[in-house]
Amino acid sequence: MYKRQLTEAGLLPGEDVHKHLTGCGQAILLAVTLGPGVDAQIRRAGVGDIAAGVASDALGSALAEQAADAAEAQLRQWAATAEKYLTGRFSPGYGDWDIAVQPLVAAALDTARKAGLCVTDTNLMTPRKSVTALLGVSDHPVKGQLAGCGHCVLRTRCEYRKRGKTCASE
């Protein structure tokens, strides 16, 4: 999609996502999900064994990120053959890109019909082990806005960082 179309559709509120797309005339939205079976397995693992539930949840998160990495790798192969350049992934909830855009991202990708991926009234995805993201597309090399703690508006009061972790590792 063209960056202008995403902006007009209300998908790009906030400054951080615009910084991420600096130099990009287009962007790609992506969504991946491990499906409802993984959510069910995590629940079953946690019955009577909290540690197994926590471990299963962490494994599911890691697998969802690996699925997103695989999707991104396919997009990078396409970009190389099309002589295009991509930024890294930037997901709703990064920086000031409000998680409230999640329903708009899901609607733009028609995730409910195509992948069974829905968004709750509180902007959480179901199945839980799912990832949505945006990558900028350009005709020249671009870096995009770096994601992570150094650029997060919550970095000074983040509960994850207080425990020596990051939200990406949860």
Predicted regions mapped to residue ranges:
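Conserved small/polar residues in nucleotide/adenosyl-binding loops
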Residues: 1-5
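Active-site cofactor/substrate anionic-group-binding motifs, chiefly glycine-
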Residues: 6-22
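Glycine-centered flexibility motif
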Residues: 10-13, 35, 93, 127
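Generic structural signal of hydrophobic/aromatic residues within well-ordered alpha-helices
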Residues: 17, 38-42, 59, 75, ...
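Conserved mixed alpha/beta catalytic, RNA-binding, or beta-rich assembly cores of soluble enzyme
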Residues: 22-91
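Short terminal or interdomain "cap/linker" segment that borders an active site or interface and mediates
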Residues: 82-160
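Short cysteine/histidine-rich metal-coordination sites, predominantly Zn2+-binding motifs
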Residues: 165-170
